[in-house]
Structure formats: structure tokens, C-alpha cells
């Protein structure tokens, strides 16, 4: 199958900026802009299985530099510590 997902294309081309553009236009990201505090927990649960966040993790693990901007956005949106969101989504990240 030579039809790759747009996220896989970005990863293969090491194009983190394009990945961010896709991420920020995604339904998950747009839904995260809601201010309903009861939504936070189910939102964070959804991050664990969402393709966006698996690619965010892949970018991070590939070079230790890219990745984390989407998490940073979300920590600001939800007023949650970035470390808390990272720990929930990416247990392997130590920073």
C-alpha cells in the first residue's frame, strides 16, 4: 500500500512543522479547546490512543528535540502541568 497517512508522511520526511499544522487542525485538538473541565479526563484518556500523539511521541523519540509542542499547547489550554500530560501520554519521557 503506497498510500501513507499524512502523519506518516510527515514523520518519514522529518517535517515536524507540517505535523503540527495537521495536529492543530485535527478534531481532537479542536475539541480540546473546549473549556468544560469535566471533559479533561476523557480528553486525556483519548490522547493515549490517538494517532496524533503516537506520532508526537515518535518525533520525540527520533531525535529528542521535536515533539512536545502539541502537549505544550494542551497544557496551556487545560491549565494542566505539561509534565502531567506527558506522563499520561508518554510514560517513557523523563523530562
From Swiss-Prot:
Tissue: Expressed by the venom gland.
Keyword field contains Cell inner membrane: no
Keyword Metal-binding assigned: no
Catalyzed chemical reaction(s): an L-alpha-amino acid + O2 + H2O = a 2-oxocarboxylate + H2O2 + NH4(+); L-leucine + O2 + H2O = 4-methyl-2-oxopentanoate + H2O2 + NH4(+); L-phenylalanine + O2 + H2O = 3-phenylpyruvate + H2O2 + NH4(+); L-tryptophan + O2 + H2O = indole-3-pyruvate + H2O2 + NH4(+)
GO cellular component: extracellular region
PTM note: N-glycosylated.
Single GO BP term: defense response to bacterium
GO terms of molecular function: L-phenylalaine oxidase activity; toxin activity
Localization terms from the record: Secreted
Keywords, ordered alphabetically: Antibiotic, Antimicrobial, Apoptosis, Cytolysis, Disulfide bond, FAD, Flavoprotein, Glycoprotein, Hemolysis, Hemostasis impairing toxin, Oxidoreductase, Platelet aggregation inhibiting toxin, Secreted, Toxin
Cleaved signal peptide residues: none
Essential cofactor(s): FAD
Principal subcellular localisation of the protein: secreted
Coiled-coil features, chain-numbered ranges: none
Role: Catalyzes an oxidative deamination of predominantly hydrophobic and aromatic L-amino acids, thus producing hydrogen peroxide that may contribute to the diverse toxic effects of this enzyme. Is highly active on L-Met, L-Leu, L-Phe, L-Trp, and L-Arg, and no weakly or no active on L-His, L-Tyr, L-Ile, L-Gln, and L-Lys. Exhibits diverse biological activities, such as antibacterial activity against both Gram-positive (B.subtilis) and Gram-negative (E.coli) bacteria, and inhibition of ADP- or collagen-induced platelet aggregation.
Subunit and partners: Homodimer; non-covalently linked.
Family: Belongs to the flavin monoamine oxidase family. FIG1 subfamily.
Protein name as annotated: L-amino-acid oxidase
